[in-house]
């Protein structure tokens, strides 16, 4: 009988070890599947919302309808963005080309606070190096034109009350694993 009890005991130990091994294999399988899912999610990650365009770490929204400059500023705020503030020549080139395809569009530049002193909606002033982007003879304030738009191959000042397309900008999200 003693031998029989010993065999039963060994059989139970063996079953426990086998069960433990199966549990470990299940855990490893779940971990592997989880790692694969994380990898797939990262590939699906979008740094910008749908209908936005990514360029050099920023997201740009090109409106599908027109409104005046102030309403455009507010529309961008509602999207947790701002009417586009241009920070580089590359960005200017990208926006100018894209806006040419879509139509005249507001940017976040105006001289509403003080005539002739152009400021971006983020409070920064227009750099001298960007003056080259004004179309010939612009800005001219011909008709109380205090807001800037993309027009043709450059910038134009226009009355802020005119309805135009508009471009919002915000930082792109990171898709890296944390």
From Swiss-Prot:
Domain C-type lectin: 54-169
Lineage: Eukaryota, Metazoa, Chordata, Craniata, Vertebrata
Disulfide bond positions: 48-59, 76-168, 147-160
Annotated PROSITE patterns: C_TYPE_LECTIN_1 (PS00615), C_TYPE_LECTIN_2 (PS50041)
Role played: Probable pathogen-recognition receptor. May recognize in a calcium-dependent manner high mannose N-linked oligosaccharides in a variety of pathogen antigens.
Known glycosylation sites: 70
Organism: Mus musculus (Mouse)
Record-linked Pfam families: Lectin_C
SUPFAM superfamilies: C-type lectin-like
Protein name, as recorded: CD209 antigen-like protein C
Record-level Gene Ontology MF annotations: D-mannose binding; metal ion binding
């Amino acid at each position: 009988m003693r031998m029989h009890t010993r065999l039963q005991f060994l059989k139970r130990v063996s079953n426990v070890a086998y069960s433990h091994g199966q549990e470990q294999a299940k855990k490893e399988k779940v971990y592997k599947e989880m790692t694969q899912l994380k990898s797939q999610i990262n590939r699906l990650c979008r740094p910008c919302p749908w209908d936005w365009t990514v360029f050099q770490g920023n997201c740009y929204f090109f409106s599908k309808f027109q409104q005046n400059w102030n309403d455009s500023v507010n529309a961008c705020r509602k999207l947790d963005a701002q009417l586009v503030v241009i920070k580089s020549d590359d960005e200017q080139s990208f926006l100018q080309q894209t806006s040419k395809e879509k139509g005249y569009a507001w940017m976040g530049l105006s001289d509403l606070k003080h005539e002739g002193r152009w400021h971006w909606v983020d409070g920064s002033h227009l750099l001298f190096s960007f003056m080259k982007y004004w179309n010939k003879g612009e800005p001219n304030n011909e008709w109380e034109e205090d807001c800037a738009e993309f027009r043709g191959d450059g910038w134009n000042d226009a009355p802020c009350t005119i309805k135009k397309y508009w471009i919002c900008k915000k930082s792109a999200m990171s898709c890296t694993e944390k």
